[in-house]
Amino acid sequence: MASHIGKLPIAIPAGVEVKIEGQNFSAKGAKGSDSYVVPEGITAAVEGNEIVLTAADDLRPTRAKHGLARSIMAGMVKGVHDGYSKTLEIVGTGYRAVAKGQGIEFFLGYSHTITVNPPEGITLKVTDANHVVVEGTDKQVVGQVAANIRKLRAPEPYKGKGIKYSDERILRKAGKAGK
C-alpha cells in the first residue's frame, strides 16, 4: 500500500528546468528558482517530462514523507512556473495601504502607521488603497506573509473592519439590542 498522493507523477511544464542530484531537488522557471532536500527513504527521478517519486519501503512514516515530498515538489514546480498570490482587502473608514519603496505602509486606525517590508522572494503590490497583493514562488511564504499582514488588524465581527483575504467571509454578530 503506497501513498496515494506520493505515487502520482509531477508534470514538468515547458520552461521549467528540474535537477535532481542525490537527495537535492531544484527547480528553475520564469518566476524564479527553488530547492528542496528530499527526505531519506524517498527517491526522485525524472522520466521524460515527469518527476516520479518512489518510497524505499511501505512503513507508515515513509508513506507520509512520500506524499509530503510529492506535494512540496509539485508546489515548487507550479511556483517557479506560475507563482502564487494572495489578495488582501482592507475594510474600514480611513483604513488604507500606500506603497513605500519595496514595502507597504498601512494606516489602520492606530495612533501610528505600520510599515511591512517583504522577505526575499516576495513582492507586495498595492492595487488600490484598499487592496494588497502578496506574490512569490513559495506557497508557504506567500501564505505566511499574507497571514502576518492580516494579523495587523484582523477583521472584527460587528462591522467587519480590518484586513481580510479577498475570498474570506466574515461571520457577523448582532450588535447590542436597542430599547
Curated annotation (Swiss-Prot):
Matching SUPFAM superfamilies: Ribosomal protein L6
GO-annotated cellular components: cytosolic large ribosomal subunit
PROSITE patterns documented for this protein: RIBOSOMAL_L6_1 (PS00525)
One GO MF term attached to the UniProt entry: rRNA binding
GO biological process: cytoplasmic translation
Keyword list, A-Z: Ribonucleoprotein, Ribosomal protein, RNA-binding, rRNA-binding
UniProt KW Ubl conjugation keyword: no
Record bears the keyword Ribosomal protein: yes
InterPro entries xrefs: Ribosomal_uL6-like, Ribosomal_uL6-like_a/b-dom_sf, Ribosomal_uL6_a/b-dom, Ribosomal_uL6_bac-type, Ribosomal_uL6_CS
NCBIfam families, per the entry: L6_bact
Subunit composition and interactions: Part of the 50S ribosomal subunit.
HAMAP family named among the record's database cross-references: Ribosomal_uL6_B
PANTHER family (UniProt xref): 60S/50S RIBOSOMAL PROTEIN L6/L9, LARGE RIBOSOMAL SUBUNIT PROTEIN UL6M
Family per similarity comment: Belongs to the universal ribosomal protein uL6 family.
Function: This protein binds to the 23S rRNA, and is important in its secondary structure. It is located near the subunit interface in the base of the L7/L12 stalk, and near the tRNA binding site of the peptidyltransferase center.
Protein name stated in the entry: Large ribosomal subunit protein uL6
Species of provenance: Bifidobacterium longum (strain NCC 2705)
